Regions:
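Phosphate-backbone binding interfaces of nucleic-acid-interacting proteins
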Residues: 29-41, 47-146
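Coiled-coil termination/hinge junctions
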Residues: 1-38
Length: 146
């Protein structure tokens, strides 16, 4: 190994071009709503898949910009969804809008669903889900300050 790093031996095939695999949970955006609820959303289709399949519980609230590509966002509330204020709902929806194709629009329609209504079809590509039951809210897009 020392000879390989010194350049005296040729690298083995398994070591050539090997990149460190980035875990989806390391690529999430995170925020806290005004009411103290944790928000998580994906940066790409792989992390969207992780958010929708691994982080969203049956009672959590799930958000996505309607009719356009965008991040899947979860508001972690467990069985306390009825305690989430309108302000917190709109705050989360604004991030879902801000991390979608509609980020530069004045207002974006955002889907709000319970986690149990979000399903991944068998064999579907990463980031693709179906939503059985939802309602929508209109919000102005918001992004984290970079």
């Amino acid at each position: 190994l020392e000879l390989e790093t010194a350049g005296m031996l040729k690298q083995t095939k398994g070591q050539l071009g090997r990149r460190q695999q980035v875990k989806p949970e390391d690529q999430l955006y995170k925020a806290v709503s005004p009411g103290g609820w944790q928000l998580y959303w994906g940066k790409n289709s792989r992390t969207n898949d992780y958010v929708s399949r691994n982080m969203t519980g049956p009672q959590d609230l799930w958000f996505h910009a309607k009719g356009m590509p965008g991040s899947h966002l979860v508001l972690k509330c467990g069985d306390s969804a009825d305690k989430v204020s309108e302000e917190d709902l709109h705050y989360a929806a604004a991030f879902a809008a801000g991390y979608s194709k509609g980020k530069d629009d004045g207002k974006v329609e955002v889907i709000v669903a319970q986690g149990r209504d979000v399903k991944k079809p068998k064999g579907a590509r990463p980031g693709l889900v179906t939503v059985d039951s939802y309602y929508t809210v209109m919000v102005a897009p918001r992004r984290l300050e970079d």
